[in-house]
Amino acid sequence: MDQSFGNLGGGGGAGGSGKAAASSFLQLPLSTAAAATAYYGTPLALHQAAAAAGPSQYHGHGHPHHGGGHHHSKHGGAGGGEISAAEAESIKAKIMAHPQYSALLAAYLDCQKVGAPPEVLERLTATAAKLDARPPGRHDARDPELDQFMEAYCNMLAKYREELTRPIDEAMEFLKRVESQLDTIAGGAHGGGAGSARLLLADGKSECVGSSEDDMDPSGRENEPPEIDPRAEDKELKFQLLKKYSGYLSSLRQEFSKKKKKGKLPKEARQKLLHWWELHYKWPYPSETEKIALAESTGLDQKQINNWFINQRKRHWKPSEDMPFVMMEGFHPQNAAALYMDGPFMADGMYRLGS
C-alpha cells in the first residue's frame, strides 16, 4: 500500500538531507493551484517526507497560519539533526491513522487517473478499492496542526487535479466543436451530417413504399436497399460542392492569375519612372498633367503611379533644410490634398523647390 502511494509529495529523494526535504515538503500551497505543480513532479512518499522533515514540520514551521517557529522547541528545533527511525515511524503512524488519510490517498489517485490509459485506470481503481476496504486507523489524540497539514495537502491535490483536467476538457470541447462543424458542412450536401448515410438509407426505404411489384422479390418481401459505399458519400459531397462553387472558384483562379505581385511593376515602366525621378529629384512631386503623361508612357494607371511615387519618396528622398524655395507662378489646388497627406509642406504648387 505504501508503494502505491510512493509518488505523493514533493522534495528530494530518500537520500536527501532532512533540512532540504523539510523546506520543500512543509510549505503547502493553500490557495494557488500553480504552486501545487511544483510538488507533484518530484516523487517522494508522504511518510518519507515526514520522516525527513521531522515532527516539527507539521507543527507550525513556515505555515501561514502560525507565528514564526514558536513550536520548534517542542521537538528539538528546526536546526537539529536527522530524526531517528523510531521517530519517523511514529510520524508515519500518526499520518496513516489520521481520519483524512483515506481522503488524501483518494485525492492522489484522482490526480494519477487524469489522462491515464485504460489499463492504468483499471489498476488505480483496484488500488483505490483495496484502500477503501482497509479498516480506518485509530486516531487517539487530537492534533490540530496535523489536521491542518492533512487538510492542506488534500486541498493542494484537489487543485492540482483541476489544473490537470482543464486542458483535457478544453481539448475535448474543441474536438466536439470541430466535429459539429464537419457535420454541418457534410449536412449541406446530404442534409444529415455524420448520419447522412443512415438518412439516405431511410430515404431509399421510404421510396419503396407504394412502389410497383418490380421492387418485390419472388417471396413477396421488399428488396433490401443496396449497401452504401463509404467512399460514395465523400464523392457525392465533393460533386455537390464543385457544382455549387465551381463558378466562384473559376473566377478566383482567373483573378489570381491576372493579379500582379505586390510592388512589382514592369521593368520598362519602372525605368521610365526612375528617369523622371532623377530629373526632378529636388522636388519629386509630379503634377496631374505629368502623371497623365507618365501613365500613357508606362501603361500604368493613376493609382499605380501615385503609389510608386509615395513609396519612392518615403524610402529614397528627404528634403534638405537649406534648400531654396521659389514661388511658383501658378497654384494647383488639385495637388494640394495629395501633398498635404504625403509631403512635409502644406500645399503642392504653393511652394516648389528651385531647379
UniProtKB/Swiss-Prot annotation:
**SMART domains this protein is in?**
ELK (SM01188), HOX (SM00389), KNOX1 (SM01255), KNOX2 (SM01256)
Give the UniProt subcellular location, in the record's own words: Nucleus
Q: What InterPro entries does the database record attribute to this sequence? A: ELK_dom, HD, Homeobox_CS, Homeodomain-like_sf, KN_HD, KNOX1, KNOX2, TALE_homeobox
Q: Domain ELK, which positions? A: 236-256
Give one GO molecular function term. DNA binding
Q: Does the keyword Nucleotide-binding apply?
A: no
DNA-binding region coordinates: 257-320
Q: Which GO terms describe its cellular component?
A: nucleus
Q: Would the keyword Signal turn up in this protein's UniProt record? A: no
Task: Give the tissue specificity.
Answer: Expressed in stems, rachis and inflorescence.
Q: Where is the composition biased (Basic residues)?
A: 60-75
Q: Where is the composition biased (Basic and acidic residues)?
A: 218-233
Keyword annotations from UniProtKB, A to Z: DNA-binding, Homeobox, Nucleus
Q: What does this protein do?
A: Probable transcription factor that may be involved in shoot formation during embryogenesis.
What's the family? Belongs to the TALE/KNOX homeobox family.
- What is the name listed in the Swiss-Prot or TrEMBL entry for this protein? Homeobox protein knotted-1-like 12
Native organism is: Oryza sativa subsp. japonica
